[in-house]
Every structure is written in structure tokens, then in C-alpha cells.
Amino acid sequence: MKFIIRTILIALFLIAIINESQCRRDPRKFRLSRVFEKLIEKNSRHHENERENEIGRAFDMDCVKNFFKLPQNGKMILKETEEMVFMVASGMKCSTEYKIFGAMFRDFVNEGLKEHLTCLKWQLKQYEPSAKLIENFEITEAELKVCQEKFPIYNEMKGFQKDLEDLLGPLNTYTCGAVSEDGAKDFLIFVSKGAIVEYGDISEELKKTEKEKLKDYFKDISIKTAECHIKRFENEPQAYQVNDTLNYYYKKDLVPTDPDQEDPNGYYQRLIKVEEAIDKDCVKQKLTLPENGDKAFVEPEATILIASAKTKCIKIDQLEFSNLFIDFALEDGQRHDRYYSCARYKLHQLDPNSQLAVITSSDKSHEKHCRHIEIRLHPFSIPINGYAESVGKLNEATCGVLTDDIVNVVTLKTMLLYDVKDKELKINETKELYGLVTDKLQKLARLILERVR
């Protein structure tokens, strides 16, 4: 039950692209980003990289330009959530194999829905009694009672939709007609049909036909939403420009306004401290940030500029850097010894002379397993992945400023700092890490500004 509700909520976010869309502007919307972040974090993490890779492969910039008339001069810079709209839309419109649909579909329709097929069919019958997927469907009184008492998905979705509309206005207006007014019903039908198609006892021919209809539905929503962004940019370009990029992303989006909001590990309080320490005049002077404010940066670029300002202008001490930086390491690294073993093993390959990379027989025993583990650096992974998806592979896009090897080394050393018992070694490694990151951030920030000019 909880899985189905969570799945529908995630579907609502991904398809309607409500958060940070520019089809309606409401300053209160920024609180939603944290709601969706938590929803997505609870989703199965092992599908995340696979889905991102398929989105990246499906994203054809030339196709986007041809179909949606993206400005050729490159002055239109989209926020990360808006890029997702175009990636989905281009994947659906340009790719004949609909890889993007397959990736999303697997997120919405899961084996966990198998045991609820009877109730899903019953729900579908309420809205589409003549649907071919439920021909000859019958339900016993006992089954009906269970569905009525324990399966009120629509009502719960309706309540969630009302909360959204209180903040955003009617969903169909907010998304320029891409989603109907009764979003709760639409997404319940989508998930119900998807589960019946995937797990129901129906003919292969009917299964294929109905899945194509679901693809068309998903494609239609994606393309309409992307076209809405293009039209809005052409008619109201100021809606996509930010006078103060730093404040826009960090004060309005990431820093909580509700004092009672959950703050795991004091993350937001540290973020506020970082924000307060940033010297904007220093950013303009050292990095020649455009003073007229008419240049908008995508969120990953803003992140890099902020980090660069922090390291260059404020002269933070090593301990503060360590506390801020290490907090972002992969959470599993704190809980599983196997990650330490894999980290040591991989770091030994990249940097055999590192004192942190003295591998043991236990580490060697994990060799095969380690090859399948991707250890990512969280504070870099979001800006780097988003930036790379937009402009090409990282080492090409940044002229070699940051390479995969550098990211891996920084990742591994950061994670290993949890495990190091030798205080002197820990201090030395932290200093080395701090110097490496500072240098790379400065170079990358300058390169971004040069690209904007």
C-alpha cells in the first residue's frame, strides 16, 4: 500500500515536473523541492544510476533543437529540473525505442503491485468500466470489502493533490494543460493499467497494444510540458533569468524556512553557515561574475561558484572544511566495511603510494564485488553529472579540469577519512584533499564564467 502511494507520488513529480517549473511562479514552491527529495531518496537507490544513464543516452540535443526550436546561441540555460523535462521529451520524441519510457515505467510499476491486482482492477473499473484490460472482471464481496477498507489510494492521492494545489494553483493550469485537472485519477489509472499490463493474465497482443497506449500518454505529457517551457521562454524570457543566482538557489531552495523542519545531521544549519560566509563582492572581483545579473546559471554551475567563493574568499580552516565535506560522502560508507575494502582496493589501483591504500587480504577477497560498486562523491556528483549531461563528457566539457580519476581519488579519500584512526595521517590527508578541491573548483568556476561570456 505504502509502496503504491509512494510510487504514484514519484510519478506525479516526474511526469508533471511540478517542482521548479516556470509555467507558474510562486515563491512558496521552493519548499516542495525538499518534499520530493525525500520521496525520491526513499525510492530504490539501485535503479538510480541505470535510469540516469538511460536518460543521458536518450538525450539528443540536435533533436531537441529541431523539434523544440531551442535558441542556437546557447543563451538559454535551464535549471536542472527543466533539463529533465527536455531529456524526457527528447527521449520520447526522438528515440524510436522509447528507452526513457522503459526506465520510468520500471519505477512506477513494480513487482510489489502483483498482490494488489484485484484492487487495481476494481479501481480501474470505477473510471473506465469498458476498458479491455478488465473485461469479464468480477470481484467477490470479501475482496471488495478489503479493497474499500485497505486500498483507498485515490482518496489519499486527492489529499496530496489538494496540498499541492494550495501552493501552486490547479495542476492543469500550472502545467499548461499537460496534466488534467484530476491528476489523482489520471495517475491512478496509469499505474493500474501498467500493473495489469505487466503482471495480469492477459493475451500478449492486448498487453502490447495497451503498453503502446501508455507510452503515447507518457510521451504526450512530456512533450507538452517541454513545449510549454519553450513558449514561456520566448514570451517571457525574464522568467528564466535570476538577478542573484547564489541567493536564488541556496536561500530560497535548500535552506529551510520552517524551524521545525527535520534537519538530519545538522545539514541545513551548516549550509546556512556556509551561505553566510560567502562574500559576493569577492566572487565578482576574483571570478569576474557579471555584475548586471542578466546571466542565469544552471544549478550545478551555481553550486560550483558558491563552493569556489567559499574556498577562495573566506579562507576556511581545515577542520571546518573536513566537517562540511565529509558529511556528503556516500552514506553506505559509514555502515558497511565492504565499502572500505572496496575503497582501499580501488584507491590502491589509482594511487599505489597513498598511505590510505594499504590493502589487506580481506580487501583482495572483495575484488570481484568491488568492480560492480560505483562509489560516488556526493557534493561533486550532482553538479558534475548535471553539467556533463548538458555539455558532454566531463573531461571534454571542462578541458580536463576534472577527470574521472580525480573524482574517484577524492571520493575514496573522503570516504576513507571515516575509517582512519591515525590522527596525524587524517590531518595530512585532509589538507591534501582540501588543496586539491580548492584548486579544481577555482579552475572550474573560471571556465564556467568564460563559457557564459
UniProtKB/Swiss-Prot annotation:
GO terms for cellular component: extracellular region. Residues 1-23 form the signal peptide. The gene is F6.2. It is found in: Secreted. Keywords: Secreted, Signal. Used by the larvae to construct a supramolecular structure, the larval tube. This is Balbiani ring A 67 kDa protein. This ORF may only constitute one exon for the 67 kDa protein. Pfam families: DUF5442 (PF17514). The keyword Lipoprotein does not apply. The 67 kDa protein is not tissue-specific. Thus, the puff Balbiani ring, which is tissue-specific, contains at least one non-tissue-specific gene. It comes from Chironomus thummi thummi (Midge).
